[in-house]
Amino acid sequence: MSEILSPGEARSPGISYQELLDTDTHEVPEVLRLESPRFLGDDDISITRYTTREWHDIEVEKLWSRVWQYACREEEIPEVGDYYVYDIAKASYIVMRSAPDEIQAYPNACLHRGRRLKDYDGNCSEIRCPFHGHCWEISGELKDIPASWDFPHLEERGSDYHLPEIQVATWAGFVFINPDPDCEPFEDFLGDMADHFEGWDLANRYKQAHIAKVIDCNWKISQEAFSEAYHVNATHPNIMLQLGDTNSQVDIWDNFSRVITAGATPSPNLDYEVTEEEILRCAMDTRHDQDTPMEIPSGSTARAIAAAGG
């Protein structure tokens, strides 16, 4: 049986990610040298969190209606009048480029009868409800009410009939919204995460393609699968030659966490020795009928070749 360790002390056989970095030929950004392990407990998590309507409703109330959440990229709404429809749970929001340097967001529902104002992303010069035609400027002010003589009470309300505004913040080209008017400042929510990306200029990147897949599972099941490398041994055994699955480092901060899994190094779970050529071939997805793409100099490693850019 395995040795019994103190809470948070358990780790895999083989070297740690930090020890692996110590053997590398290239220095890494300081942020990759940070370590923030936290023991969050080992009590069982009830299946109800993944399967019940009651728990879903709790998340809608306490999470999706109160937390800062990524809605779209700025380059998806580059021109004035461009808008993006962001749906989460039963809620829908219009994220609008209302001026060259301003992004606003509104609930995607007409104030008259609640009909969705926009069904798809696009560009518009006004926001007109497709049901009765109540219309707002893209900046949210009331523009027109058909048969306004029958709605004197709305005319009197004036700015009261403005589309409700949802809080918006941007960081590195990402657009975030928060439906809670009393939410914490975005800067506090982001915390130190921006520091982790100082070496990666995400603001000047763009999304070339958007690929989505509907998965028949609770959202947490899907997200958790991409927050660990524990499944590699059973699900992706073909990449174990070049992936240090259990060498992974897991770090947890207040509002974000990260998992770092090293490539071009064999899994400690393998029960046989792997050559550097085998590691390189696996890392470069070389077929059995193909020659090794390059020669590894004597004394070098596949990981060093990868760090040098091939």
Named regions from a protein language model:
Residues E76-P181, P185-H196:
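Rieske [2Fe-2S] iron-sulfur-binding domain
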Residues R38, D42, E54, F151, ...:
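A near-ubiquitous, low-amplitude feature marking generic local secondary-structure context
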Residues E59-Y70, E141-D150, A307:
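Short, basic/low-complexity N-terminal boundary segments at the transition from targeting/disordered tails
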Residues S2-Y120, I166-T170:
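N-terminal pre-ligand scaffold of iron-sulfur
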Residues E74-D82, K90, C129, W136, ...:
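A sequence-level detector of short, solvent-exposed, charge-rich linear segments
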